[in-house]
Amino acid sequence: MTIKSVSVKGIDVANEQPFVLFGGMNVLESRDLAMKIAEHYVEVTQKLGIPYVFKASFDKANRSSVNSYRGPGLDEGLKIFEEIKSTFNVPIITDVHESYQAQPVSEVVDVIQLPAFLARQTDLVVAMAKTGAVINVKKPQFLAAHEMKHIITKFGEAGNENIILCERGSCYGYNNLVVDMLAMDEMKNYAPVIFDATHALQKPGGRSDSADGRRAQAAQLARSGMAIGIAGLFIEAHPDPSAAKCDGPCALPLDKLEPYLAQMKALDDLVKGFTPLITD
């Protein structure tokens, strides 16, 4: 099965189209902070003419430490998403970790994300598929690009072909990730591909009880991914990354969002303006 494009509230997500930004914050820390971050993203993306989907998690169920902040939970999280959606008129993407969450989440958000560590969990895949929502599948750090076909097939067998694939890095020894650009390009043969340029900066477990990251290289890594010609970019930002409750070492400073996205848009426009070059 090959999926050429999916539509998110009228936004065309396809590898040949102008890139779509899936961006926001890692985890909902408070209603006020979420509103502030969403407002800034909306202002910047409207100014630059970039299609936009707001992202945040209501529960980080896979934290390194049992003592780490997880989020406000399903009920409170959905209330915040509803307010963001109605206030700013933007689509929403969030992740689910258990089958029972899929249906209530689908009634509020527009894209449901399948976490990388759970991407082979068939019961969760089926529950998500049955909602009919657009699904963003994070590629597990331990799978090859061609293995993503099996996950797409699971969704298809359950009646859902509205699939996006998301690259977020591959394990490279302990506490390290690398991004295989050739593998990301290969995934374009199966579905629209977006690049999680935030979590690909991670050093999982690099701080013993939490992940470390390489925020200083946020632009370099994202530019590398955009050069392939992909459907979208997935990023997280925070007004004060050092104080973020999850993945601060990977988060883009919120005040750098506009110049960062301006570079990505310029590169996306350039790459997609090239005449396709067949070298095989």
UniProtKB/Swiss-Prot annotation:
Provide the protein's localization.
Answer: Cytoplasm
Name of the protein in its database record = 2-dehydro-3-deoxyphosphooctonate aldolase
User: Known InterPro entries for this protein?
Assistant: Aldolase_TIM (IPR013785), DAHP1/KDSA (IPR006218), KDO8P_synthase (IPR006269)
Q: Which UniProt keywords apply?
A: Cytoplasm, Lipopolysaccharide biosynthesis, Transferase
**Pfam families, sorted:** DAHP_synth_1 (PF00793)
GO terms of molecular function: 3-deoxy-8-phosphooctulonate synthase activity
Where does the protein principally reside? cytoplasm
